[in-house]
Amino acid sequence: MSSLREPGQAWQSPLRESCQSCHCGGFAPLPRIYCARIPVPFTPPKPIAPTPEELRGSTVLVVDDERAWRVILETDLKMLGYKVSMAEDADQALVRAQADKPEVAIIDLMLPEPMDGWGLLNELRARGQKVPVIFYTAYPVFPSGTDDPDVVGYMSKAVDRADLYALLPVAIRRSRERRNSES
């Protein structure tokens, strides 16, 4: 049985025989794994460590073309005590970086044309803005052998956000050390 359905037709589980006793009767609006009769493993999120007091108020630039991710990260980062600067593409990010002077940037690797995350990092450098970067992406494939001093880490959007936020103090301290050594 094909899992594709015609418009307006209810989704029919390919496992209909084993689904007869539940509320959906084999016609669940969502794929079978969401059937109320089947326990779905749940891993609770990791607790997010509080932001060290000396880092509260640090500016984080978030660059992502997906509005939902920008909202999630902005909400979390503000709750953690950071100032947040938002951009949905590389052009906006360059303007925000110039105006807000972020201490760290969280950049989606797969930004829309004309400039992806790497292109944005290179353009920031060309403009004299050395900002530690945490790249994150929906694609779990990261470059291997990249030893770039401005890249603090690569994260998949599928991982627990606590892991992403744990990199922020490292990146901000690196940014402050660099600024102190240059002045």
What are these regions, as identified by a protein language model?
Residues 64-66, 157:
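Acidic di-acidic motifs
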Residues 134-136:
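Hydrophobic/aromatic residues positioned on beta-strands within the core alpha/beta folds
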Residues 70, 112-114:
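The feature encodes the CheY-like receiver
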Residues 95, 116-130:
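Short amphipathic alpha-helix used as the core "switch/output" element in two-component signaling
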Residues 138, 146-156:
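As written
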Residues 86-104, 109:
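Acidic, metal-coordinating helix/loop segments flanking the phosphotransfer/catalytic sites
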Residues 3, 19-61, 160-183:
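Non-catalytic signal-transmission and effector/linker regions of two-component phosphorelay proteins
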Residues 67-85:
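Two-component/phosphorelay signaling modules centered on CheY-like receiver
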